[in-house]
């Protein structure tokens, strides 16, 4: 097996001059490797090593500097000192005692000191680093938050997909004893209920519902159509079930301007208009319930349709549609005579009357000369003679 460079190793000169014994590495090296397992003579063989003369030697093709000079004699190191080796050895061919082909030489005693228990170990990483003091590590990297159990990290069932088409293995959350905290009820406030129009005098008996905190309350629009239950409550004087057991006083409807022609007969027969207005003094009847709902907004003042541009409210959806055209500039109605465009159909109809009047005037002016050009019969004067 051949060695590759993993790191530069600080080695003393004496270790290069004194050859290691041949039986130091047997053919099958056990897992617990001891570099100095010889007799006392072999240990004394290294007592003359000088620990001060150290140089970096790599296992590559780099040649050392030939100009360096070395002394012929080596003085023994004062005291009982040790030399520490730090590095790794990588091998091309794998062996049964080193599966990862990497040997990490952490430390080895030289002068009769027994090596540490972790002197020689195999690691799966490709580089070794000297660990800094524990205080510096804690200062640079704060400690991670402790976890009581695995359920804090994995609270949902984990499933693994098999590419061969087998069904995934699902692990139930019973293995991870954890319970999710319940959602705070204050996190999502209740949305206001617009199922029924409330009179200003009755707002005190209804619990207050606040919209979302980040949303403007004026932009929360009620539904466009008043529910049919509200109309029946007006008509039959019944208590709406949404109010519970609290009695609701009858809703007073605001009077409206009287009709210009109150006794004008309607084209639709009376029996085909079963929906009558419940307001006092109003004799309006309608054939459809939605027409009555739209009419009741006149009495209640309810304007559920709101423009999101200028925040103006309307009681009818078609009024909102024509109002939005003032912001967009859309004019879909064009005059048939002059091509002028209008945003509302009634404006075009009013404008068309101008052309009709002009046409009538032209026809009148064209008919007057034809009447004057008719031939007139002139009678001859009667001549009388006197005798």
UniProtKB/Swiss-Prot annotation:
A zinc finger (C2H2-type) spans 275-299, 305-327, 333-355. Keywords: DNA-binding, Metal-binding, Nucleus, Repeat, Transcription, Transcription regulation, Zinc, Zinc-finger. GO terms for cellular component: nucleoplasm; synapse. Residues 241-283, 348-387 are annotated as: Disordered. InterPro entries: EGR_N, Znf_C2H2_sf, Znf_C2H2_type. It is found in: Nucleus. Residues 350-360 have a biased composition (Basic residues). GO terms for biological process: cell migration involved in sprouting angiogenesis; cellular response to fibroblast growth factor stimulus; cellular response to vascular endothelial growth factor stimulus; endothelial cell chemotaxis; negative regulation of apoptotic process; neuromuscular synaptic transmission; peripheral nervous system development; positive regulation of endothelial cell proliferation. One of its GO terms (molecular function) is sequence-specific double-stranded DNA binding. Its main location: nucleus. The keyword Transcription regulation applies. Transmembrane segments: none annotated. It holds the Pfam family DUF3446. Residues 269-283 have a biased composition (Basic and acidic residues). Belongs to the EGR C2H2-type zinc-finger protein family. Probable transcription factor involved in muscle spindle development. This is Early growth response protein 3.
């Amino acid at each position: 097996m051949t060695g590759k460079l993993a790191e530069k190793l600080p080695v003393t000169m004496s270790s290069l001059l004194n050859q290691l014994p041949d039986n130091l590495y047997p053919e099958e090296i056990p897992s617990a490797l001891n570099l100095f397992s010889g007799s006392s003579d072999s240990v004394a063989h290294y007592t003359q090593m000088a620990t001060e003369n150290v140089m970096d030697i790599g296992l590559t093709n780099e040649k050392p500097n030939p100009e360096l000079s070395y002394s012929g004699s080596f003085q023994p190191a004062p005291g009982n000192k040790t030399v520490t080796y730090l590095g790794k050895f990588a091998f091309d061919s794998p062996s049964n005692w080193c599966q990862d082909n990497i040997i990490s030489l952490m430390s080895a005693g030289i002068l009769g000191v027994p090596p540490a228990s972790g002197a020689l170990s195999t690691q799966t990483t490709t580089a070794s680093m000297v660990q800094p003091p524990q205080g510096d590590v804690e200062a640079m990297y704060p400690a991670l938050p402790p976890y009581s159990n695995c359920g804090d990290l994995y609270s949902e069932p984990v499933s693994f997909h098999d590419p061969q088409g087998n069904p995934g293995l699902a692990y139930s959350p019973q293995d991870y004893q954890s319970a999710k905290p319940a959602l705070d009820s204050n996190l999502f406030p209740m949305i206001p209920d617009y199922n029924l129009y409330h009179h200003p005098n009755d707002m005190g008996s209804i619990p207050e519902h606040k919209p979302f905190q980040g949303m403007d309350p004026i932009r929360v629009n009620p539904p466009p159509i008043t529910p049919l239950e509200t109309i029946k409550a007006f008509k039959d004087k019944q208590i709406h079930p949404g109010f519970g057991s609290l009695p609701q006083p009858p809703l007073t409807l605001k009077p409206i301007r009287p009709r210009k022609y109150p006794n004008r007969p309607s084209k639709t027969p009376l029996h085909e208009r079963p929906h009558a207005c419940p307001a006092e003094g109003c004799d309006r009847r309608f054939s459809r319930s939605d027409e009555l709902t739209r009419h009741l907004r006149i009495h209640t003042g309810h304007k559920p349709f709101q423009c999101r541009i200028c925040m103006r409210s309307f009681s009818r959806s078609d009024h909102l549609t024509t109002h939005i055209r003032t912001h967009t500039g859309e004019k879909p109605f064009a005059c048939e005579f002059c091509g002028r465009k209008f945003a509302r159909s009634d404006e075009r109809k009013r404008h068309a009357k101008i052309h009709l009047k002009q046409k009538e005037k032209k026809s009148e002016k064209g008919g007057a000369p034809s009447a004057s050009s008719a031939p007139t019969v002139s009678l001859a004067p009667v001549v009388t003679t006197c005798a």
